[in-house]
């Protein structure tokens, strides 16, 4: 995949981490060039135009191995995910968990997912196993991504896979509210 200037700039922002100089660039492991901020990992077959760094001793390529029992999830559009981020802003939350898979109860930081979709635009599928295992992203090319899931408590706000704002502990009646951001569904006690 030939990387655009915008994708390279986004990767430069990811590898700019003053707390971890060993990740301020890309490094080679196995057949892949890897860029990471320790919350998301990007795997490239061809070396991006970024400086080389020390990297880490942990084998990050092993994270791409998924068991046969893993669930494959078709990803929503990037526009949908940007909308999820906007809902988090409307709720005055920096991070609002997005329910990537309701059956497996896997939640993800929507900001990291949008970033993954922008850096790897051909990514169409996520593979997950449990709420605590890394989520692997792949598409049509030879590049991959991994995002570590969010731990989500059963009683806190989240956005479900249909884009609805859910507040599980406040009852069951759903009321539509209009605000300056957009129409948001919330759950209120009865």
What are these regions (language model features)?
Residues 1-190:
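DNA polymerase processivity clamps
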């Amino acid at each position: 995949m030939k990387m655009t200037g915008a994708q390279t700039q986004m990767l430069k922002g990811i590898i700019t981490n003053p707390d971890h100089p060993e990740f301020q660039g890309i490094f080679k492991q196995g057949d892949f060039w890897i860029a990471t901020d320790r919350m998301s990992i990007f795997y490239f077959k061809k070396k991006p135009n970024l400086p080389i760094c020390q990297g880490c001793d942990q084998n990050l390529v092993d994270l791409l191995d998924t068991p046969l029992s893993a669930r494959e999830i078709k990803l929503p559009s990037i526009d949908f995910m940007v909308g999820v981020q906007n809902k988090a802003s409307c709720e005055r939350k920096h991070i609002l968990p997005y329910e990537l898979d309701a059956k497996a109860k896997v939640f993800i930081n929507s900001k990291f997912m949008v970033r993954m979709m922008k850096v790897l635009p051909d990514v169409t599928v996520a593979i997950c196993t449990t709420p605590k295992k890394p989520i692997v992203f792949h598409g049509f090319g030879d590049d991959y991504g991994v995002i570590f899931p969010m731990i989500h408590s059963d009683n806190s706000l989240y956005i479900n896979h249909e884009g609805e704002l859910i507040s599980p502990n406040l009852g069951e009646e759903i009321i539509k509210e209009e605000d300056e951001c957009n129409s948001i569904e919330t759950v209120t006690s009865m």
